[in-house]
Amino acid sequence: TFIKLLCRLYDPTKGHILLNGVDIREYEEAQYRKLFAVVFQDFKIFSFRFGENIAAGEKVDEERAMDAIRRVDLMRLYNKMPDGLNTMLNRDFSETGMEISGGEAQKTAMARAIYKDAPFVILDEPTAALDPIAESEIYSDFHRIVQDKTALFISHRLSACRFSKDI
């Protein structure tokens, strides 16, 4: 609920949410939402091309997509894709579509957030589908992954707090 309130998917029933001292309802909604790249706990992977899943509705910029893929450690998956960014995911619309694991799907959702290049990155339980080794790699590389963005990392695991600057 907190994330949905912050991103203006819900309006608060009481009180105000301020950004730089201004009630967020004062900002133009579409412009305000561009400030956030969110990976919700119940993210979706679409039966589209891999690059389209990362670009999420934008025209696929190959350089930006590849940067996001590298930052979330998806190069092994990418290297197995017969058509690279044009590889179809899932087999809903293509018999040759590639099925990916839960961990690969979670990293693809993270790549989508990185690709958006918003100033705020919000990750809700972003390591839930990852094995312990991949989870540890995300934690140790987190600052490199989000780079100069303000990041909000939501987790029920105390171990996720080790890499955080502020709790």
Show which residues each predicted segment covers.
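Conserved catalytic loops of ABC-family nucleotide-binding domains
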Residues: 144-155, 161
